[in-house]
Amino acid sequence: MGQVLPLVTRQGDRIAIVSGLRTPFARQATAFHGIPAVDLGKMVVGELLARSEIPAEVIEQLVFGQVVQMPEAPNIAREIVLGTGMNVHTDAYSVSRACATSFQAVANVAESLMAGTIRAGIAGGADSSSVLPIGVSKKLARVLVDVNKARTMSQRLKLFSRLRLRDLMPVPPAVAEYSTGLRMGDTAEQMAKTYGITREQQDALAHRSHQRAAQAWSDGKLKEEVMTAFIPPYKQPLVEDNNIRGNSSLADYAKLRPAFDRKHGTVTAANSTPLTDGAAAVILMTESRAKELGLVPLGYLRSYAFTAIDVWQDMLLGPAWSTPLALERAGLTMSDLTLIDMHEAFAAQTLANIQLLGSERFAREALGRAHATGEVDDSKFNVLGGSIAYGHPFAATGARMITQTLHELRRRGGGFGLVTACAAGGLGAAMVLEAE
């Protein structure tokens, strides 16, 4: 076992997570169509503060993330502070770590708490795949800058005359990695082939995810942690996630064609997480501050770890790399965990990470460790379903996972939970949570 790194303040306080909330998650261009991420962020933070009954002035910092950036609101965190009635003096800044963005936001607030610069803060993220920054071609962008500097009408007309019809076409946001040109689905296909993961295995995991998420809603387990969203023109509220298939059937999965490798692929729209809109946030504070306010924490942040690997081959292995570090820093092993919640970007990616966590060879050759991190116990794994069912508003997923895991730990009488995710750019994140 390597070095244990206790997450405590100088006074010995643990980092408490006292509350968490999210909007329902909605598939792209459905319930939240036309609502930008900043408004989703305001919605969830405003409701989180109202439910917690914590005075706004208690919150000294807000760290928030957004992956699909909107040029008109580059600092989503500050806009949320200004748009929710929080104290205008509340420090606020934005972060981005692709699909692990709200993991990063939580880590940043935790670091401020440990440094003693704040005693309470909010971390979270929001994304909209329905309100996108549609750009212009590079040639048109350059001409527009030059036109703005031109002094005469003839100079402006001369500049515009250089453009062709194709230069005027809108440019949608990139869906591929900047450095490689590979889409996330292409990487998932790589991983399915590298680790021998079949179409049947992927469909089975997706089916399991939907079944468990549907059951979680049916049992009322998510009601406390998901707000009702009132959407303009306010005719009908959104109460639950709208991607979950309550009637999920393996036979239906088998009918779908591959989405990326059309000829030989196994990754489909059904065994991948969909483009989604939503927001999620958590309130963190020092343990002593929570006691002062009479709050009973949901749980505590025991450890966290971030990792990075090469992007050209099988880059969505973040959980396999970051989990052993987070466990080591928490002074725990896989067998000590009560729950394991892994982000399901794709069924292929999820199954590959499960395989490598139990691989002695991967531990030796890739991680330089003597033994495998540990087998993943199916009875502890994604017990309420995962991102394939709930959806994945990129910056909000980590906060969803943290809140969901802490609530489930409390229902089970406490214990330790691991939340972990892969992210674009070959990044990985893992956090160990504790509930009493």
Curated annotation (Swiss-Prot):
**Pathway stated in the Swiss-Prot or TrEMBL entry:** Lipid metabolism; fatty acid beta-oxidation
GO CC list: cytoplasm; cytosol; fatty acid beta-oxidation multienzyme complex
| GO biological-process terms attached to the record | fatty acid beta-oxidation; fatty acid beta-oxidation, unsaturated, even number
Residues annotated as the enzyme's active site: C99, H392, C422
Q: CDD domains in the record, alphabetically?
A: thiolase
Listed under catalytic activity are: an acyl-CoA + acetyl-CoA = a 3-oxoacyl-CoA + CoA
The UniProt entry lists the main location of this chain as: cytoplasm
Location(s), subcellular: Cytoplasm
UniProt key word Zinc-finger: no
Name of the top EC class for this enzyme: transferase
Q: Does the keyword Acyltransferase apply?
A: yes
Q: Which UniProt keywords apply?
A: Acyltransferase, Cytoplasm, Fatty acid metabolism, Lipid degradation, Lipid metabolism, Transferase
- A GO MF label: enoyl-CoA hydratase activity
- EC assignment: the record states 2.3.1.16
- Spell out the InterPro entries in the cross-references: Ac-CoA_C-AcTrfase_FadI, Thiolase, Thiolase-like, Thiolase_acyl_enz_int_AS, Thiolase_AS, Thiolase_C, Thiolase_CS, Thiolase_N
Q: What induces it?
A: Unlike the aerobic pathway, the anaerobic pathway is not strongly repressed by FadR regulatory protein.
Regarding protein family, the annotation reads: Belongs to the thiolase-like superfamily. Thiolase family.
What do we know about how this protein assembles, alone or with others?
A: Heterotetramer of two alpha chains (FadJ) and two beta chains (FadI).
**Role description:** Catalyzes the final step of fatty acid oxidation in which acetyl-CoA is released and the CoA ester of a fatty acid two carbons shorter is formed. Strongly involved in the anaerobic degradation of long and medium-chain fatty acids in the presence of nitrate and weakly involved in the aerobic degradation of long-chain fatty acids.
Q: What is this protein called?
A: 3-ketoacyl-CoA thiolase FadI
Question: What species is given as this protein's source?
Answer: Escherichia coli (strain K12)
